[in-house]
């Protein structure tokens, strides 16, 4: 059986975590430290941590790059690392610890919309479709070679929340289909064309306001893109 570790944080990573747990020997889940949330300001675990504990999988919550590298090293030997919306850059020294490599499931058709907010930016741009891409991770931000991708239509009523859910499940299925062939060396990576790259930086709450001087279509896209959050 394929030996794996998983890195992710939000609810959107749960479908992939579920399939990785089902089809591999999942050795470790890495997620962000508990953060203050809600009116109480009490630290709360990430969605991925809660699910990992439910599945009885060991959890690592590193607070530094070195803690991340050390924790991943202690999970060896493992064949593959799978990352979905982890929220931090993984050092190259950690990427080298997998026998085969680290995969990143990204919620766009790379090289379009590299970065932290691809779903919101695809809606803001008025695009009719987007998708998911699995890349082999390298030192860059979403720059690694493409292993697989799948197109998803953006419905006129889609919000970032509804589209994220669709992409999360589409990506999880793509992982199931890809993993055996990847580990056996039967997948030919395809380099991204950097000249075609566009970028999707994180959108701060202050940027999510509405300017009613904008056309109605642009306002509607902003409402959809920032629902349920920027």
Where are the regions that the model predicts?
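One-carbon transfer enzymes
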Residues: 1-228
